[in-house]
């Protein structure tokens, strides 16, 4: 399941190379904001120490440990939307190669999304940490489903605030703050009203990287959200 990560893995040799690549990715992300690869690589290069902290939190949790051992992946092969949509409504996950649920499948189908669109981690030097960051990117859509937020600019920014508070990743922090300035006046006011609750949920809920989504077979979405203290 890590073949793509291994084949794509290109750790940078020294701090100078890391800084120069970081600078180039930042320029490209600014010049070509619709190209997700540049922003993704910027997140990798700026989030190394934060990813190490996330890895430690996973090691200190029994479920997180199992995720690190099993290294499950979110791919079109493991998350077949057409199969997910056959499950009972209001469920979230199913075991084996189906995983997830009607809610997640509907979310992906209605928006014409594919889990294969997530760029593969490239620059994080340690392969174990590269997996951790890849896992974060691959469960991002699950967070949308759990928080009940869509994929408009406003909704994406709200999710980024949650991720910033939960994970502390620089890329999430940058997206949360910079993205907020791009909202119109009405959306900014709505965000100000929403933020206290989102930050509260981020602080009280289970650490999202320690959730083994693939093991929630036919779990009712509301029950799952309750168990994760998201309600």
From Swiss-Prot:
Write the record's keywords in alphabetical order, separated by commas.
Answer: Lyase, Membrane, Metal-binding, Mitochondrion, Mitochondrion inner membrane, Ubiquinone biosynthesis, Zinc
Q: How is this protein situated with respect to the membrane?
A: Peripheral membrane protein
| Xref: InterPro entries | Coq4 (IPR007715), Coq4_euk (IPR027540)
UniProt entry tagged with the keyword Lyase:
yes
Q: Would I find Mitochondrion among this entry's keywords?
A: yes
A cellular component term from Gene Ontology for this protein is: extrinsic component of mitochondrial inner membrane
One GO term of the biological process aspect: ubiquinone biosynthetic process
This entry's Enzyme Commission designation comes to: 4.1.1.130
Q: In which pathway does it act?
A: Cofactor biosynthesis; ubiquinone biosynthesis
Give the reactions, separated by semicolons, that this protein catalyses: a 4-hydroxy-3-methoxy-5-(all-trans-polyprenyl)benzoate + H(+) = a 2-methoxy-6-(all-trans-polyprenyl)phenol + CO2
User: What are its cofactors?
Assistant: Zn(2+)
Q: Which residues bind Zn(2+)?
A: 140-141, 144, 156
Task: Report the locations given in the UniProt record.
Answer: Mitochondrion inner membrane
Assembly mode: Component of a multi-subunit COQ enzyme complex.
Cited PANTHER family: UBIQUINONE BIOSYNTHESIS PROTEIN, UBIQUINONE BIOSYNTHESIS PROTEIN COQ4 HOMOLOG, MITOCHONDRIAL
User: What does the function comment of this entry state?
Assistant: Lyase that catalyzes the C1-decarboxylation of 4-hydroxy-3-methoxy-5-(all-trans-polyprenyl)benzoic acid into 2-methoxy-6-(all-trans-polyprenyl)phenol during ubiquinone biosynthesis.
As a miscellaneous remark, the entry gives: This protein may be expected to contain an N-terminal transit peptide but none has been predicted.
What is stated as this protein's family in its record? Belongs to the COQ4 family.
What's the protein called, per UniProt?
Ubiquinone biosynthesis protein COQ4 homolog 1, mitochondrial
The record lists the organism as: Paramecium tetraurelia
């Amino acid at each position: 399941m890590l073949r793509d990560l291994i084949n794509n893995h290109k750790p940078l040799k020294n701090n100078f190379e890391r800084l120069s690549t970081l600078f180039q990715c930042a320029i490209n992300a600014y010049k070509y904001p619709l190209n997700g690869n540049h922003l993704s690589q910027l997140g990798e290069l700026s989030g190394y120490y934060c990813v190490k902290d996330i890895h430690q939190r996973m090691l200190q949790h029994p479920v997180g440990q199992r995720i690190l051992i099993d290294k499950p992946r979110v791919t079109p092969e493991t998350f077949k939307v057409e199969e997910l949509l056959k499950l009972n409504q209001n469920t979230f996950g199913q075991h084996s190669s189906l995983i997830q649920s009607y809610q997640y499948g509907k979310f992906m189908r209605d928006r014409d999304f594919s889990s294969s669109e997530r760029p593969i981690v490239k620059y994080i030097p340690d392969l174990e940490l590269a997996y951790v960051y890849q896992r974060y990117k691959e469960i991002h859509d699950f967070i949308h489903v759990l928080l009940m937020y869509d994929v408009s600019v406003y909704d994406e920014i709200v999710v980024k605030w949650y991720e910033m508070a939960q994970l502390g990743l620089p890329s999430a922090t940058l997206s949360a703050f910079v993205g907020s300035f791009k909202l119109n006046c009405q959306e900014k006011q709505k965000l100000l009203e929403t933020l206290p609750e989102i930050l509260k949920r981020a602080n009280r809920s289970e650490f999202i990287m320690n959730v083994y989504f693939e093991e929630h077979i036919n779990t009712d979405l509301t029950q799952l959200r309750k168990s994760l203290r998201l309600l």
